[in-house]
């Protein structure tokens, strides 16, 4: 999917990977970039607007843990303004295994709820035009960082739900793929808590491994958007982009 002249909603588009990805998206010339984030950052929005004055960048405060009905109201406002939306990026995430309920609420439930809300506007069974969803998951959805089992499990759940969305595309008209970054230098990984303090130095130890910059990740994210492959499981690690094959150990046959 060419980004040029498209209308894009980016949930958590002002975070570490999110903000660099927003920059790269704006450079590609969408018609509208709507950023939904919990904390307003006027300086960041101003930077995005200055980067490409031909792109309309707007911001709405949004907490992904609100009920689906509240999300639907916000999306109604956006659809009333833009008329059409081509791409939804779900990027909200926290890494802190002290906060068990919130980790699950943000990393998994919030992604599912935002997706459920936008289906009211996209689902072809309701006369919608369809759309594309890109969910930011994590390589920990493939293999856990065992010191942060809550975070890893939440990302595995988000990945699994994204794979299911892709399979449902013939029914809903909505395609989906996952973005799974490896260890990336962002504020998220500089300091975080392991579950029950099983490894107090987990953040420090993790950063001893090879990493990538958030810019490298963002540039490959844009390549994945442009590839627009329904069901793709993209691994963005060490500055590379790779579509991985999901190993099937069981099939429902339905």
Curated annotation (Swiss-Prot):
Pfam entry (one): adh_short
Signal peptide boundaries: none
A single GO molecular function term of this UniProt record: alcohol dehydrogenase (NAD+) activity
One cellular component (GO) term of this entry: cytoplasm
Residue intervals passing through the bilayer: none
Binding-site residues for NAD(+), renumbered to this chain: 10-33
Keyword Oxidoreductase listed: yes
Catalytic activities: a primary alcohol + NAD(+) = an aldehyde + NADH + H(+); a secondary alcohol + NAD(+) = a ketone + NADH + H(+)
Cystine crosslinks: none
Keyword Oxidoreductase: yes
Residues forming the catalytic site: 151 (proton acceptor)
UniProt KW keywords: NAD, Oxidoreductase
GO BP terms: alcohol metabolic process
Residues that hold substrate according to the record: 138
InterPro entries: ADH_Drosophila-type (IPR002425), NAD(P)-bd_dom_sf (IPR036291), SDR_fam (IPR002347)
Assigned EC number: 1.1.1.1
Highest taxon of source: Eukaryota
Family, as annotated: Belongs to the short-chain dehydrogenases/reductases (SDR) family.
Oligomer status and interactors: Homodimer.
Protein name listed in UniProt: Alcohol dehydrogenase 1
Organism whose genome encodes this protein: Drosophila mulleri (Fruit fly)
Taxonomic lineage: Eukaryota, Metazoa, Ecdysozoa, Arthropoda, Hexapoda
